[in-house]
Amino acid sequence: MKYSAPIRLNTLGAIASQHGVLVVIGMLLVVPMAFPLLPIIATYCAAIFVILLPLGRLQHVLATASSVAFAWLLTLRNPSKGLVEAGLGDDALHYMNAFYEFQQAYCCGPLDVLKTGIRSAGGGEPIFWFLSYSVAKLFDTPLLVWAVLIFISLMLAWIAIYRCSERFAYVVFVSYLSTITLYALQGSAIRQAVAAGLVMIALDLLIRRKLVSAAGVGLIAAGTHSSAAVVLLACAVVVLFLSRDYGMLARRSSGLGRVGRLIVLLALAAAGAVFGSAEFVMSKIQARLSESQTGSAWELQLAVEAVLACLFAWLLRIKLPREEKMAFLLFVVVCFSTSLFAPAVGARLFRYTYCFYIVYLCAFFFARQGESLGQKKTLASLLLLASFGWAIFIVSARYQGLFVSGGVIDHFLAGPFF
C-alpha cells in the first residue's frame, strides 16, 4: 500500500517533532564551528563561478569581500595561547605595542613616529610607520589597525593581479590566498606584506614597460620594508644594463629615452640617499646577522619552486619578456647567495619569489591569446584545485593556530551559543 501525500507529510512532521530538539542542538554545535570556515568556502566557490562565467568587474566585489574576510580571520589568532601555536612570531606583539602607542599619543611628530617604530619593531621604514600612524588614529584598538593593514596589503596584490589578467584575476588572487606567504606575512611580517603588494604592482608596470612608474612604486615599497629594495635593484640592473629593448629605445628617441633613463637613475640615487646611509644599513645587517636561524628548508623549497617554475614556463611556452625572466633568475641567485652568510636575510627575500610567480602567472593568462577559452578554463581549474590542496596542507602543517588554540573556532565556541 502506497502512502498518500498527506500521510507522508504527517510522517515527516512527526519525525521532525520527535527529533526537533536534537536538530536544534546539532545546529547550535555545528554553526559556530562551521561559520569561521564559511568565508574560506565562499572564496573558493566564488572562484569556481569566475571560471565558469565572465564576471568582469564584479570580481572587484569578490576580491574586496575576500580581503575583508581573510583580514578578519587572520586577526583572530590569539598570541596569549603561544606564538607558535597561533602561527605568529615575536614581531606581532611588537607591532601591537607600536600601534597602541600611536593610539595613546595625542600628538606625535614624524621623528617620534619613526622612533616608536624603531623601538618597537626594530625597523625605521618611514612609509609603513606613517601609514600605521594614520590608520591608528582612525580606530580604537591595535587589532583593528592590524586588520586594516592586512586588508591594504591584499588589495594592493589584487590591483596588480587584475591589471595583468582580467578574465581569471580572481582565480589567481585565490591562489595567493592559499600560499604560505599569506599566513607568514600577515602575522609577524605585516610590513613586508604591504611591501609585497607594492612589489607586485611594480613588476606589472615593468612588464608594461612603464619603467619610471615601476621605479616610483618600487621606491615606495622599499620605504615600506627595506628588503623590497633588493627586488628593485635586481630589476633595475636588468633594465639598465641587460635590456636590449630599453637600450634601443634610448638610441632611437634622442631625447625621451635619455630623459627616462636619467629619471630612473635619479630615483635609484634617491633610494641610495634614503636607505643607503651607513648607519641604516649597518643596523639592518647587524639585526639580521644576530638572528639565529638554522636549517635549509626554505632553501630547498626555493630551489624546487624555481625549477618547477622554469619547467612550467618551458612546457606551456609562457610568453614573458626577456627582462622579466632575467630579473627572476637574478633574484633567485641573490637569495641563494645571501643565505650563505645571512640565512635570516635570505629567508625574508625568499618571500618575494611568490610576487614573481603570481604576476608572471597573470601575464601567462593575459599573454596566451592563441589558446581557446576552454583550455584557459581547464588551466584555471587545475590552478584552483592545486591551491585548495596546498592551503589545506599549509594550515594543517604549520598554521593550525588559526583555527584552534585560541583561534577562530575557539573564538566562536566561546561566543553567544556557549
UniProtKB/Swiss-Prot annotation:
Main localization, broad class: membrane
GO terms under biological process: polysaccharide transport
Keywords: Cell inner membrane, Cell membrane, Membrane, Plasmid, Polysaccharide transport, Sugar transport, Transmembrane, Transmembrane helix, Transport, Virulence
Organism lineage string: Bacteria, Pseudomonadati, Pseudomonadota, Betaproteobacteria, Burkholderiales
Membrane spanning residue stretches: 21-41, 45-65, 142-162, 170-190, 222-242, 262-282, 296-316, 326-346, 347-367, 377-397
Location within or outside the cell: Cell inner membrane
GO CC term, one of those recorded: plasma membrane
InterPro entries: EpsG-like
Keyword set includes Transport: yes
A Pfam family: EpsG
Protein function: Probably involved in polymerization and/or export of exopolysaccharide EPS I which functions as a virulence factor. May play a role in export of EPS I or its intermediates across the membranes.
The protein's name: EPS I polysaccharide export inner membrane protein EpsF
Entry membrane topology: Multi-pass membrane protein
Keyword Methyltransferase included in the entry's annotation: no
Family per similarity comment: To S.marcescens SfuB.
